[in-house]
């Protein structure tokens, strides 16, 4: 039995009507384009120019000088999912 802990990391982003954060576990987190003011104002090309930082613990968008973290995304999702119930 494998008892090692797997660290959840961001694998990639997929863009359509929302931003899909694909994790190495196979899970997806969905963010609206108004997640931050800079992301809201960015065009698709600026958002598609991203790189993973911190070994997959965050995302850097150099064209809009924005960094977001997996921890921040999880906090956002938790609070917004609770508000929706």
Spans of features found by a protein language model:
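Motif-centric detector for short Cys/His coordination patterns
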Residues: 1-85
